[in-house]
Amino acid sequence: MKVFTIGFTQKNARKFFSLLRDNNVKTVVDIRLNNTSQLAAFAKGEDLKFFLTEFCNIDYIHDTTFAPTEVLLKDYKNKKVSWLDYEKEFNRIMERRNIRSYISKNYANEDSICLLCSEALPNQCHRRLVAEIFKKTLNEVQIIHL
């Protein structure tokens, strides 16, 4: 299984959709807590779903099971917690949600998915953490950051 990750900031629509299409992504899994971002018009939930399905033949799922809690996200954005503390707390949240079992049940039969969040780079984004959990959970997972 290929687990791609992508952030939509610092990408225009052409680059964003071309990366997904050119890498044969089958399903975009939007793991944002809120998918109505004002950062890029093409990345709003219903619009994004329309563009992906109609123009790229890519399925779209908004799955907040992989999202941080509102409190953790707010604390990180307001610099009340460091990235290291965010990462630790996020992983604890995933454990409490039995995320590995959830992945096995809901995503084990996928060929290729792309985890979507807003951050331009994966280094300090929860999509990287989720991709790593996929790799620990399923056999032969290849992580590719777009």
Regions found by a protein language model. Name each.
Residues 1-146:
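Residues lining hydrophobic/aromatic ligand-binding pockets adjacent to catalytic sites
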